Amino acid sequence: METLFAQRLPDVNLEEAIATLHSEGPGSPSTINQSPRTPDFNAIPSPSATAHVNASKMSEAVPQEADGFDWQEDFSELADGMAALSVEPKGTGYLGSTAGVFFLRSLLLWMGRSTSIATAHEAVVRSPKAEEHNLSSMALQSLVSRQVMASLIDSYFNVYHVSYPFVHEATFRAQFHEIIPRPSHRSWQMLLSTVLALGAWCMNHPNTDLHDDLYHHALSLGEDESMVESGNLTFVQALILLSNLSQKRNKPNTGSNFLGLAVRMALSLGLYRELPDWDISLLQREQRRRVWWGLYIFDSGASTTFGRPILLPGPESMDVRPVLNIHDESLTPGTTNLPAETTLPTLYSGLRAQSSFHVQTNHISNRLLSASGISKEEALSLDQALDSWSKSLPSYFQISQAPVFYEQWYMFARSKLWWRFWNLRIILFLQVLLGRSMGRSNITAAGKPPYVLDETCRNICVEAAHLSIVSIHQYLSQVVPTRIESWYAVFFIFHASLVMVLAILADDGSSPELPSWQADLETVKSVFRHLLSNNPLAARSADILDRILRPEPVVGFDAINFLDPASFDFSQWPAGDGDLLSSFGWLDPGQGP
């Protein structure tokens, strides 16, 4: 970058220009348009709390209109469920600095691909499906036969439930066949419709009409005002599952709203409390735990994915115990003695480990949303806490230990847990990596030379990306992935691939690691085009990588403003020749995997 600066502005001293940017007063062009900061009533002490307020501005893509963050997801979709490809901020809701799209925006801006937007969005056309689905009074039996229902329920429990066991299978099946009484009619119908819709989604059939009909039927059941005037465990289960299905259908804000309602309803039911004196059965108590921790991991994960604060209660206000690591046959409605937990993995091991992960790390995700950013020292300190958590995992989840067996549900739970761990590590060091690559001093504690810790931070971030790519490639090479496995594989490997892109583009060709980074990118593209060849989002992601790495001259490059974080306005990007941004899904949206 120094060479480019010297070529374009030979009479300007780079170091002096940077120093000038950091010394500008309150009325300078770089700060005059800043909004007042909201008071922070519960800030975690940081050595960088007042340093370099502009450090996170590179991530703040804002629409031109005051209502530009408004969203309407029953229209043609502008958002993607992974919050990784929606570069244009208008119509997608606010996506903060832990969202994957933050990385993509910053990377594209750093490359100088776009500087202003001259054309507005095309008029959004209401989806025909939105007009056709007036299903509130339609009986479920008119949509699908009893035999098809049974097949969809099997699909749900064989594919989705083994990853997210929030619904007790034996109880649900007994209620479905009316062997035991069903819960409140409307909440049960909403849960049944959502389970059927997820079962259809898991089948990944080319004909999506059945999946669409079942999804909209579940939505219509939730539109009745009586649904928000009552609360029960079945309704919370339905909301949790409906939120996740909405996200998988590229309706992230719709899903987020369902999660918000589910959290409030769960709190009203006391699911976050153990209540040991309550005279309920062991299975009923355990099911309350499973629903609470299922909601906890979904809301935590979605908030981090969308770059929004996690508003769940912390350990200081929760006393509900973790889910038991037991097999289903060990706990039935008639069980009166608490079963002993097994030392081997069960369907509930992944839920238990991931809920522990979020309890211990949610403060990290929230800290990363700070407007002032974090210092390298604080990032390394938080990483140590993250590393300490990983060492507390049971041996069957330790990456250094061989798997105890090779059943697919266990291998996926084990792999996904580490993909999530490495992804948070990538996010943790992202600001440092971007600042280093852009040739700008990132935040550091007072008295510390700005680049002393750069290499350590970069190495941790790049290693996390490399381990993600290797692990995902190995996993997909050994199995025929289910649709839910494919979705998470694309999500995590795309984030990791952008780290490698940044490392390659920031390197001057002298790094001995360059061939390894290039090999990792080739692995990612092979995963997208071969191991996930039937996944539309994988194909789009591979195309994005090709476009990013395609040589393109920088036209009209303003070096001084490029170095000024306050000038990073992503709302002013053009849809230029070839329309790079159209491949991100906001002009030509496609269905999720």
Name the predicted role of every residue range.
Residues 1-161, 186, 190, 209, ...:
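Intrinsic, low-complexity transcriptional activation domains
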Residues 65-69, 73, 80, 85-126, ...:
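Fungal transcription factor middle regulatory core
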Residues 68, 74-88, 92, 485, ...:
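Intrinsically disordered, low-complexity transcriptional activation domains
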Residues 107-108, 112-114, 119-234, 241-251, ...:
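C-terminal transcriptional activation/regulatory domains of eukaryotic transcription factors
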Residues 214-217, 221, 258, 265, ...:
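Alpha-helical solenoid repeat scaffolds, predominantly canonical TPR units
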Residues 232-240, 286-289, 351-358, 410-431, ...:
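Amphipathic alpha-helical protein-interaction segments enriched in hydrophobic
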Residues 249-265:
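Classical protein tyrosine phosphatase
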Residues 522-567:
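Eukaryote-biased recognition of C-terminal alpha-helical segments
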